Amino acid sequence: MEEKKVNIREMTMEDFEEVHALWMGIHGFGIRSIDDSKEGVERFIRRNPTTSMVACENDRIIGAILCGHDGRRGCLYHVCVHEDYRKQGIGQKMVEACLAALKREHVNKVNLIAFKKNDIGNHFWQGMGWTFREDVNYYEYV
């Protein structure tokens, strides 16, 4: 079996349509029309130009992570890999690339939100050694 060559690189706004299509193709993926609109993602990328990543095979985007920080703490959003490419280490490589980008900006602490019903995602984060926090409550103002 031929090994697929996957390239991890910084996400740019030129990637938006393909990344958005990837998000929309994943069952149960949580998208917000305001934050995840082209304008919302552009604002995010402009603020964090070097920290979000895509995984590409033959110029086709098969994975993506929005990653940013506020100068103190990083956050990962919309971590996803196309279903046909899972369990090949692609998600882990993208996360490692994001963490390296954050480290270059002197950000060492990173958070993320995984929905309770997202068994695949929760298993992934536990497998990567991330700590599940039971000592905090998460609040949101929309």
Show the residue positions of the predicted features.
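Conserved acetyl-CoA-binding loop-helix of GNAT-fold acetyltransferases
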Residues: 87-100, 127
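Conserved GNAT acetyl-CoA-binding A-motif
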Residues: 102-114
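A short beta-loop-alpha structural element at the N-terminal edge
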Residues: 5-19
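A conserved beta-turn-beta hairpin within the catalytic core of GNAT-like acetyltransferases
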Residues: 68-77, 86, 132-135
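Conserved beta-strand in the GNAT
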Residues: 54, 60-68, 75-77
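Conserved active-site alpha-helix within GNAT-family acetyltransferase domains
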Residues: 92-93, 116-135, 141
